[in-house]
């Protein structure tokens, strides 16, 4: 009986070749799109480098400020540096808490040399504890660098190769919006699907005036927080 069904199916395919081709191509494309969507969701949800701790991380991307008496007077946005520090950096139960800026476009260049536009993120030193980057050379900027507001930078491999022609650039100087930064490390390129950690250049937010950029009585600003729990059960 199965042989008869197969023969009938083959006969119908031969009789209506155009319709058969359209149906097969449509089915293949539908399956392909479903696979792409599933893979994209998996990449954004599952633990993967550098966001290997997603299963025990809490992402605080925005906040809402509401007036105590005027209930219609409310606003939602990212938080200021002051708000992030007072609300989250004082926590003692988590393994680590990092405060980061949203991505910004910045001009990266060499004195008298090449230049390019890069995606830049400003972070604290705990960022390198929460996220696990693959360093090709060097290391991240330290807590001392951060607290001193030193102009240190970690760059991606593609930026290093584009500007210097090599990834062995630790100790060399790069200009970010015409300000000199010393490169402390080079990391493997990060996928844009790693939305919490993606950038091409990372610098301490204390090396800029980002802390002064706030509004709504210093509650809101350009910062986000990631809280790393000690276990996924926390």
Each model region followed by its residue ranges:
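A short amphipathic helical element positioned immediately N-terminal to and/or at the very start
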Residues: 2-14, 83-87
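Generic structural signal for small/hydrophobic residues in well-ordered secondary structure
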Residues: 13-16, 23, 44, 58-62, ...
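Short, strongly hydrophobic transmembrane alpha-helices
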Residues: 15-44
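Membrane-proximal extracellular/periplasmic loop immediately following the first transmembrane helix
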Residues: 37-107, 220-224
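Extracytoplasmic/periplasmic beta-strand context in beta-sandwich domains
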Residues: 56-58, 118, 139, 172
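Solvent-exposed, non-transmembrane alpha-helical starts
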Residues: 70-81, 114-119, 147-151, 190-202, ...
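The feature marks short, hydrophobic/small-residue-biased sequence motifs that occur predominantly
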Residues: 91, 100-102, 109-140, 146-147, ...
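Mid-to-C-terminal secondary-structure elements
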Residues: 124-141, 151-234
């Amino acid at each position: 009986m199965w042989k008869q069904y197969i023969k009938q199916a083959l006969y119908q395919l031969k009789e209506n070749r155009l319709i058969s081709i359209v149906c097969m191509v449509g089915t293949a494309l539908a399956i392909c799109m479903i696979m792409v969507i599933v893979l994209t969701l998996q990449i954004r949800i599952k633990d993967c480098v550098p966001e290997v701790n997603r299963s025990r991380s809490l992402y605080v991307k925005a906040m809402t400020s509401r007036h105590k008496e005027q209930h219609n007077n409310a606003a939602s946005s990212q938080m200021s540096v002051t708000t992030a520090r007072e609300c989250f950096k004082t926590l003692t139960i988590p393994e680590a808490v990092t405060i980061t800026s949203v991505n910004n476009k910045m001009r990266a260049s060499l004195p008298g040399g090449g230049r390019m536009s890069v995606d830049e993120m400003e972070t604290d030193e705990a960022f390198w504890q929460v996220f696990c980057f693959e360093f090709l050379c060097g290391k991240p900027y330290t807590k001392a660098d951060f607290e001193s507001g030193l102009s240190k930078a970690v760059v991606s491999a593609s930026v290093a190769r584009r500007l210097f022609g090599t990834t062995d650039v630790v100790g060399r100087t790069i200009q970010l919006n015409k300000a000199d930064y010393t490169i402390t490390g080079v990391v493997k390129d990060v996928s844009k699907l790693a939305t919490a950690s993606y950038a091409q250049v990372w610098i301490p937010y204390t090396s800029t005036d980002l802390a002064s950029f706030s509004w709504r009585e210093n509650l809101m600003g350009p910062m986000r927080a990631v809280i790393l729990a000690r276990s996924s059960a926390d």
